[in-house]
Amino acid sequence: MKIKDLFKNSITAALVFVSLSTTAMATAWDDYKQRYLSAEGSIIDTGNNRISHTEGQSYGLLFSLYYDDQESFSKILNWTDKNLYNQEKGLYIWAYKRHENDPVTDKNNATDGDLMIAWVLIEAGKKWNNPEYRKKGEKLLSVIQNTLIVTFAKRPVLLPGLVSFLENSKVTINPSYYIYPALNGVNKHTYQKKWKQLSDEGKKLITAVEDRKVPITPDWITLDLNGKVYVSDKWPARSSYDAIRVPLYLYWEDENAPELAEWKKWFSSFSADSTPAYVDVISGEKANYNMSSGLLNVRKLVMGETVSEPVFTDKDDYYNASLSMLTYLAYKHAFSQK
């Protein structure tokens, strides 16, 4: 072999090695961005008419913070502020429906998105030594505290949104909006007891739900003036795609949380490949199809199995991919503060 050919082959081999090394270093966040993050900074819900919402934006901020991606963080935050921030309320409009003439006709907020954004901004301020992020998060927290945490039946309650959930005789609650690592994080940051009390009451609510054949958390619950907690009649009585985040957040804060016991018992009734996607907690009727990838990762987390960094396929829509990412961060107890 001539020296020239040997040199050429060596260069080719080196380039192949570099290419393979770069591919190996790609993270789940890199793949997630490619699949669900637009060039402008919106997270696209591929399973819901390609809308964007504060849930997705907050997840995008969280993931970019975890992977130390300041460029994506800034892009996502700028899009969220430009398109979803409600100056009058000081909160974020819950959804951007790009297929409609007015993408933000519904001005209501979704409190889980606001809470996650506030927490992540505060954590970003710490990690990247950016006081503007911290102040922005604290300002949003203040609005949440003053408008979305109410006392009802002598207990603090987190409203799912400003509009439609609080009535004279009852309040409707989404248990998955109690993001326990976030509540713990902001409690440690602010030293305000209200956040710890809210977290504690959230756990009491999910264990107090009456009239259930299946004792896991439903997607929506109702608290009445007498302090009775029951499955909301405004939605199907299911534990499904919302409620699956409850054990995820419980584990994230404390993998030994006693509230996980019923979830472990439920999951252990099925093999991983035959666990139903949802169950009606009143009737016991189960879905006729099984859990998809994101839900299965939550199951794996709760059952004490190792959770690896996710690898996505074309079958994974936005929500399944997001659940898988959240589960990985929960397994790592990312940003947790004991």
Predicted features by range, described:
Residues 2-11:
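Bacterial N-terminal signal peptides that target proteins for export
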Residues 10-21:
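Bacterial N-terminal signal peptides
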Residues 22-26:
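Sec/Tat signal peptide C-region and signal peptidase I cleavage site
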Residues 27, 50-54, 112, 135-307, ...:
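Extended ligand-binding clefts on enzyme/binding-domain cores
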Residues 28-114, 312:
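N-terminal carbohydrate-binding/catalytic regions of secreted carbohydrate-active enzymes
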Residues 61-66, 116-126, 181-185, 248-252, ...:
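Short glycine/serine- and small hydrophobic-enriched flexible loop segments
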Residues 68-71, 84, 125-128, 144, ...:
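A generic secondary-structure signal for well-formed alpha-helical elements
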Residues 108-145:
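A generic, well-ordered mixed alpha/beta core segment in the N-terminal half of proteins
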